């Protein structure tokens, strides 16, 4: 369940029903890229949005993706900067995929590998179930 705050007093909650993550490593940029593909159902909609209109549904998807991305970046940044915690398994991923590259990073940065890695997150979200709707979604 993910809750999105659409304004000061209203929220929308979605249930992620399918999620797949692809991970790419770019050694030249010291970058790990996460591509997260989610399918979700709308559980609750308390925002002033007419999801019967395709444009508004797409706008809602984009706003939720942006909010999710911000939350993930904030969490990872805090865990790395304050606790040097590797909850995503960045180091293990690099070690398993490119062991020699990992050794280079370890030699260069020691325990500070995480603080010297870049990461990028791309999120795709498709709202697949919208609950009980009395009218058909239009392409307006």
Residue ranges and their predicted role:
Residues 1-140:
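Active-site environment of non-heme Fe oxygenases that use a 2-His-1-carboxylate facial triad
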């Amino acid at each position: 369940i993910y809750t999105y705050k659409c304004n000061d007093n209203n929220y929308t909650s979605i249930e992620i029903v399918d999620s797949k993550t692809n991970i790419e490593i770019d050694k030249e940029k010291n970058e790990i890229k996460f591509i997260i593909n989610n399918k979700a159902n709308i559980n609750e909609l308390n925002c002033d949005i007419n999801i019967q209109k395709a444009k508004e549904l797409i706008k809602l998807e984009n706003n939720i993706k942006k909010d999710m991305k911000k939350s993930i970046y904030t969490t990872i940044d805090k865990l790395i900067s304050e606790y040097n915690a590797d909850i995503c398994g960045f180091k293990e991923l690099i070690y398993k995929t490119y062991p020699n590259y990992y050794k280079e990073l370890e030699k260069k940065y020691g325990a500070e590998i995480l603080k010297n890695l870049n990461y990028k997150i791309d999120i795709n979200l498709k709202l697949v179930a919208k609950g009980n709707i009395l009218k058909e979604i239009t392409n307006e």
